[in-house]
């Protein structure tokens, strides 16, 4: 099972991915659970991550770099774990590229999707999208990067992108709303309840 967490900066997706990973470890054991992230996930991608999040480059060049890192990540980490029957949780994946590079920076959405199809990138089985007010999210963001220098309009476009992804792919995506009004445990419980309702097999030892 491949699960991803998505949302704008400060939405709490990183802590929620960690909480769900720890929850599954208690059920299935640490060796059957893989927690990873993007940009990153491999030695190569982690080295490039710092450059990607700090240096400004052309949006299409950025897209190509992200996809090359993702291909490496899927081939070396995600698919091998899934083939062994492990649960894989990833903090950001394809949807972040669609929302940030597509909706936010204006890269053609079909180009983004076609390039992923070209290199046969696997889509997640389940995606949790954490929706939060833009200004509150940015005030909470801990991992400062170049995107946080963008204006509110940029982040509103990114947020809209995530919302539209959730609407267009309801079988894969579950959107958690009003994050700003909930504490981390409340959000975690809501996510576990959604897993219980849609993927009960994950809760069996």
Curated annotation (Swiss-Prot):
> Which Pfam family, an example, fits this chain?
Thymidylate_kin
Which InterPro entries does the UniProt entry name for this protein?
P-loop_NTPase, Thymidylate_kin-like_dom, Thymidylate_kin_CS, Thymidylate_kinase
Q: Name one GO biological process term.
A: dTTP biosynthetic process
The GO cellular component terms are: cytosol
Q: Which domain of life is it from?
A: Bacteria
- Enzyme superclass (EC): transferase
| UniProt keyword Transferase present | yes
**What does this protein do, in the record's words?**
Phosphorylation of dTMP to form dTDP in both de novo and salvage pathways of dTTP synthesis.
- Similarity field: Belongs to the thymidylate kinase family.
Q: What is this protein called?
A: Thymidylate kinase
Organism the protein comes from: Wolbachia sp. subsp. Brugia malayi (strain TRS)
Q: Which gene encodes it?
A: tmk
């Amino acid at each position: 099972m491949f699960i991803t967490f998505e949302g704008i900066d400060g939405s709490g997706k990183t802590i929620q991915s960690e909480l769900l990973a720890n929850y599954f470890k208690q059920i299935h054991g640490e060796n059957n659970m893989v927690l990873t992230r993007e940009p990153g996930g491999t030695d190569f991608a982690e080295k490039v991550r710092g450059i990607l999040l700090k240096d400004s480059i052309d949006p299409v060049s950025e897209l190509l770099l992200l996809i090359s890192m993702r291909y490496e990540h899927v081939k070396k980490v995600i698919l091998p774990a899934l083939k062994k029957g492990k649960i894989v949780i990833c903090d950001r994946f394809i949807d972040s590229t669609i929302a940030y590079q597509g909706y936010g920076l204006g890269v053609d959405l079909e180009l983004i999707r076609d390039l992923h199809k070209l290199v046969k990138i696997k889509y997640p089985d389940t995606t949790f999208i954490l929706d939060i007010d833009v200004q509150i999210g940015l005030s909470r963001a801990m991992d400062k990067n170049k995107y946080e220098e963008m204006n509110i309009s940029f982040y509103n476009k990114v947020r809209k992108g995530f919302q539209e992804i959730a609407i267009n792919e309801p079988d894969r995506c579950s959107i958690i709303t009003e994050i700003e009004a909930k504490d981390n445990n409340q959000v975690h419980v809501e996510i576990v309840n959604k897993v219980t309702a849609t993927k009960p097999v994950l809760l069996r030892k």
